[in-house]
Amino acid sequence: MCIRDRECIEQLEEINVIPDIVLCCCGGGGLIAGISTAIKTKFDNAKIYSVEPEYFDDTKISLEKNKIVSNSMKHKSICDALLAEKPGNITFNINKINLTSGVSVSDDEALIAMNTAFKHFKIVLEPGGAVALAAAISEKVKIKNKNILVIASGGNVDKNIFKNCLKTETI
């Protein structure tokens, strides 16, 4: 956790950017716990948001209720890497300190973000890895005139899902 997250800070320092807002995908909460801990040590004023698939926003709801809440698991999502039933105990205790709140995005918003990443940056993202970008594109948080750090991770995407994303709109 420490090496990867320290690299994030070093890259921000290298380009001399102070993030106002950080958007990061969230399943069980491990990635965002590490990222948020690193960000908060250097950029204490940054607002950090977990981004989850619609109907699988257990971290968002858990943060709102200040206790771990489980998803019903009766819905489906293409964001298969993020379909945790509930936040991890250790990661939730870290995230409730570091995170501003959570947001959720639809599968369609994730597909648009995947297409946008591919068309504009030539990056192939899996649906779960595209949710943070989806949150920025769909303005789930106010980002105008802010420095936004979007954590886009994972390129393990089913070829049929990727073909579908290429048929969606893009920004």
Regions found by a protein language model. Give the residues of each.
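Nucleotide/phosphate-binding catalytic cleft detector across ATP-hydrolyzing
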Residues: 1
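Glycine-rich phosphate/pyrophosphate-binding loop at beta-loop-alpha junctions
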Residues: 4-97, 143-144, 148-171
